[in-house]
Amino acid sequence: RDLHKEYRRQRQMCIRDSLPIGHNQTISQPYIVAYMTEQLQVEKHQKVLEIGTGSGYQAAILAELANNVFTIEIIPELAEGAEKVLNKTGYDNITVRTGDGYKGWPDQAPFDRIMVTAAPEEIPEKLVQQLANDGRMIIPVGANLFMQYLWLIKKDKDGIVKKEKILPVRFVPMVKE
């Protein structure tokens, strides 16, 4: 798909810095987008929840890998902009909604994979509850911009949850309604 035509900063997509997308938000560094996507181990038959739609770029990547992507953005203007771009580029397996990511998307749960692209102070229990058995969630966590870590949450086939701290990161804070 021709995402680069819609996400015009093609040269900047190779740098190691986050990029501003308006409303005091950023798109993650390209290597973090790739790393988080790889850690999720998304398969084609799966249903994915993304918290923090932003520009829609990460949702588009997930949609190339998964059957269905549901993405929530708390800032209405970003959600609307992302939805326009995603529709224009032919992504019919992505559903965009404006809302509070802390609540997840209960009427579409459970999700095989959950990706969170903004940092809450703690892992939201509602998101863990919406993770399917044999599911994986990747989430940056930390109140202080300089003390955040990326966590990989795995729920086994019996519903037992294991949490692994994997990498120091810097993300915008996750916002509640």
Task: Label every PLM stretch briefly.
Residues 17-18, 23-46:
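Conserved alpha-helix/loop element of class I SAM-dependent methyltransferases that forms part
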Residues 41-160:
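Conserved nucleotide-cofactor-binding alpha/beta core module
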Residues 3, 37, 102-103:
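Short hydrophobic/charged patches on amphipathic alpha-helices used for structural packing
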Residues 150-177:
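Substrate-binding/catalytic lobe of Class I Rossmann-like enzymes that use SAM or dcSAM, i.e.
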Residues 1-15:
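Single conserved hydrophobic/aromatic residue that forms the stacking wall/gate
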Residues 7, 26-29, 33, 55, ...:
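Short, conserved glycine- and acidic-residue-centered signature motifs
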